[in-house]
Amino acid sequence: MNRGQWLASYIGNNKAVGVELGVLRGPTFKALIKICPNLTLTGIDVFTPDRYWQANKITTTEELLKIQPLSWFDELLEFCREYPYRAHIRRDFTNKAHANFEDGSLDFVFIDADHSMEAVDEDIRLWEPKVKKGGLVSGHDIDMLSVKMAVMNHNPQYEEGPDNVWYWKKE
């Protein structure tokens, strides 16, 4: 079972609102939209090679949007047009995009963006408040030391799922 299938089994046919941080080419994003008919999902990614925006010290959304996105960004936008009320892509930094979501408004967040310890730590800190009580705080790549350290800083009792998924239910 891969991470998309695992998350889809959690969501099922329930009405749910979620965010995926770090979409890349969109395999998990697309799978969730196709499998979960009552899911509204927003995918957030810079859609620019990290080395480019980091080397050029780009830190604002305005600066980011001036850069030509990677080719698969347009493919994901086209996919979203097939599901106009349920599938949304936002080109932004994860530490900026959180401001567009109300606290307690999400059923889940799936964190799979920048895998540095500092970035994962920041994503959890900024996005966990957006998840409803009883919702899922989750992500990918728990097999990476940087991810594991950040996750353990927030919840030492986290659980693991297939395909290197980590998660906990928000209390």
Give short role names for the model-derived ranges.
Residues R3-E171:
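S-adenosylmethionine/decaboxylated-SAM
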